[in-house]
From Swiss-Prot:
Intracellular or extracellular location(s): Secreted
Signal peptide: 1-22
Keywords from the UniProt entry: Carbohydrate metabolism, Glycoprotein, Glycosidase, Hydrolase, Secreted, Signal
Residues with glycosylation annotation: N237, N398
Entry GO CC: cytoplasm; extracellular region; intracellular membrane-bounded organelle; membrane
Protein name, as recorded: Exo-alpha-sialidase ARB_03431
Similarity section: Belongs to the glycosyl hydrolase 33 family.
Chain's role: Sialidase is able to release sialic acid from a wide variety of natural substrates.
Length: 408
């Protein structure tokens, strides 16, 4: 064997040993693989479509968010889009709860029927972004008058055209906050927080969507367009401020990495790769492209699974530069969640009769140490037009299912 071949063999062995060691070092990989999936928010074209107790139904469901409360109950939120799948018009903020704090959403029958957080008038309510704070659940959401839309010119059911969102009080996008202190059973009337938590003169706005976090030091952090919203003070009685982030995206995720720092992982502007910045409540560094996380300019979701060894941060998005149907869940073992080297495609656990899975997502850690994920799916009846129905899938899987993926 020549010296070059010998050196090459050493490199190959070293790389193989490192990869093998990384897998072996996580004891979760030795457990039996588990996954389960089913449609949770059923669109109007599906058998037994979801409707409110009033009988009101929805063409489509989009923009999911999920959290586990202090009791262990799971709350799943979504936008109920009345007439089509688009971002404008009559959209209600709806949700489901698990029937008990202990069933973890194992089966479709474990959930209560569809309820409404808010849907006042023909307005556009959405971008659910909950955060659990002791016995209080804060739910941030966005709202605009139904006569307006982001770019204007959209046709409403009565034939009128929407106006373009502008910086006037009536025409701008508003930030609202509602709370629950009974495990999501009831919600307070939403309070408009726009004047204190949205930059002056900003017309369009988006909070989350997804979820906020509670830091190890006690503060709450909620991602929003161009900023973080910070909750200080005692649990359930927070005072709120905003932290402006230069270069932040229109839709952001937030997590506290195992090293105690904060990481924003944002939707990129053009299609390509995720935009990431790290920092603290005192300030963030610049956003930079993460070339290891391809993204088709869509929302993603992130979850701090645990901070003790082996520390794990979970990330989910469509791992493609140009399509939303390449959904993948990944694990990072880095203290700063720098690299997500292990992952698995969701299509490895296919689900029939739900359309084409992919798009927005949200994750939570369930009481039985599984990962619960809500993922959008598009029926694509008119090739992505406004008539294509959208539903939302609920997935449960364990760490072993990710770790033992065929591409690891």
């Amino acid at each position: 064997m020549g010296i070059k071949q010998w050196l090459l063999s050493l490199v190959v062995v070293a790389i193989s040993a490192t990869a093998t060691q990384a897998r072996v070092d996580d004891p979760a990989g030795k457990a039996a693989q588990y996954h389960k999936e089913y449609a949770l928010f059923r669109s109007a074209n599906m058998p037994s479509p979801d409707k409110l107790a009033s009988g009101v139904g929805f063409h489509s469901f989009r923009i999911p968010a999920v959290v586990r409360t202090n009791t262990g109950r799971i709350l799943a939120f979504a936008e109920g889009r009345r007439h089509n799948n688009r971002d404008y018009g009559d959209i209600n903020l709806v949700y489901k709860r698990t029937k008990s704090p202990t069933n973890n959403g194992e089966n479709p029958t474990d959930w209560e029927s569809l309820r409404e957080v808010v849907g006042t008038g023909p307005h556009t309510w959405g971008n659910p972004t909950p955060v659990v704070d002791g016995n209080t659940i804060y739910l941030f959401l966005s709202m605009n008058d139904g006569a307006y839309s982001q770019n204007g010119g959209n046709t409403l059911p009565d034939g009128t055209k929407t106006k373009t969102i502008d910086s006037t009080w009536v025409g701008r996008r508003h930030l609202y906050l509602t709370t629950s202190t009974d495990d999501g059973d009831t919600w307070t009337k939403p309070v408009d927080m726009t004047k204190t938590l949205t930059p002056d003169g900003q017309a369009w706005d988006a909070v989350g969507p997804g979820n906020g976090i509670k830091l190890s030091t006690g503060e709450l952090v909620i991602p929003a367009q161009g900023r973080n919203i910070i909750g200080h003070g005692p649990s359930g009685n927070r005072t709120w401020s905003m932290q402006v982030l230069k270069g932040a995206g229109s839709e952001g995720t937030i997590c506290q990495t195992p090293d105690g720092k904060l990481m924003r992982n944002d939707r990129p502007g053009p299609m390509g790769h995720r935009s990431v910045a790290r920092g603290t409540l005192a300030g963030f560094g610049p956003f930079a492209t993460d070339n290891g996380l391809p993204d088709p300019a869509c929302q993603g979701s992130i979850l701090s699974y645990n901070s003790d060894e082996p520390a794990r941060t979970i990330f989910m998005n469509s791992a493609s530069t140009d399509r939303r149907t390449a959904m993948r869940v990944r694990i990072s073992y880095d203290k700063d969640a720098a690299k997500f080297n292990f992952g698995r495609e969701l299509k490895d656990a296919p689900l029939g009769n739900v359309g084409n899975e992919g798009g927005y997502s949200s994750m939570t850690k369930t009481s039985d140490y599984k990962i619960g994920a809500l993922v959008e799916s598009d029926w694509y009846e008119d090739k992505g037009g406004e008539k294509s129905h959208r539903c939302i899938i609920w997935r449960r899987f364990n760490l072993s299912w990710i770790i033992n993926g065929p591409n690891n």
